[in-house]
Amino acid sequence: MLKIQPARERRAGGKKLALALAGGGPLGAFYELGALHALAEAIEGRELTEFDVYVGVSSGSLLAGALANGIDTTAIGSSFIHDEATIPFSPDTLLQPALSEYLGRMARLPQSLAALGRQFMREPLQGWPGVVGSLSNVVPTALFDNRPLERYLHEVFSSPGHSDEFDRLRSRLYLVATNLNTGESVAFGDARHSHVPISRAAIASAALPGLYPAVKIDGEHYVDGALIRTVHASLALEAGADLLICVNPLVPYDASGVRGKRRRNLAEEGLPAIMGQSLRALIHSRMHVGMASYGARFPGADVLLLEPDRHDERLFFANVFRYTGRNRLVEHAYQRTRRDLLSQADQLSRALGRHGLTLNRQRLRDRRRTFATAGEERAARVRRTARRLDHALHRLEALLAQGRPRA
């Protein structure tokens, strides 16, 4: 669904563009990839890799870091979906057991048992609650290791033409994490934290407690940035954004039933479905409170919000760890976003036009387009441009050679 919050005031110029990407785990990242690809081909006048400000939270930090580095959605798709990139991505990267965490916690067991024994001697009738409390520091804090993801991101961002340093980017990039010991949000990429590698900041922003361990940076431990706020879009607006596009992949699933379909009872779907729905409800309600305040706080900015439909069963129950699941989810998000953009084309065109952008309606109406074919078309345009540039360089070299004095 597309929600448009037009500016209450008009500012001169008005061409500073920003993109804010919320989190949502692997599922959210693949949804955002499809939605962003639809945006990239529909909006003309500026590439998504040419925006002025990027904000990433949780899994959104991975995509924000890539776009700020000039890596477009076609290249991201080649890596994440088709395994065709120079540095391909495997979902196994996200599921490596946190062995060092397990071993480190086990090493504490003798000391904890000794402390428990001393406590039992003092209070022999304390019961099981006291035992469990005494051994809590032995329980691993995470299931999976986020260091393989950090190594992958560092390799990608350090490749030729890119950078793993905030200060070397053309645009401003903010990746938001939560300080575990203070409960405060930290925006890596601001003046105080721009020395941190982008790859390190990204895994800190995406360190969901229980799944991934907290990330230590400058003596502090950081976890998922969505614990405090969902999108942190105000960072982009405070940086002077005139047009802000937000993508939020997590909305509560409405299981009340779509016409012609049997109602699904989430209570029967197991713990992951119940926890997922609870998290979505919390994140979504909190985000809309923040979005509602932007009109008064930043009256000169147009704000666009893209979200999935609440009845989208395919998105809620998708399995992103299977190749077909990833491919279908990205394609599904791509087509749904194209539909949403076209359904509000008139209002969207006016909002984009205020910032020197246009909406390609013909491309949105083309039902033959898919995520894959759109990517191939975009790659073909890049190749044609590269060939023209190569031809121009050869001609320039020939002209320079003709002008050189002979020995």
Regions found by a protein language model. Give the residues of each.
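Patatin-like phospholipase
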Residues: M1-V57, L62-A407
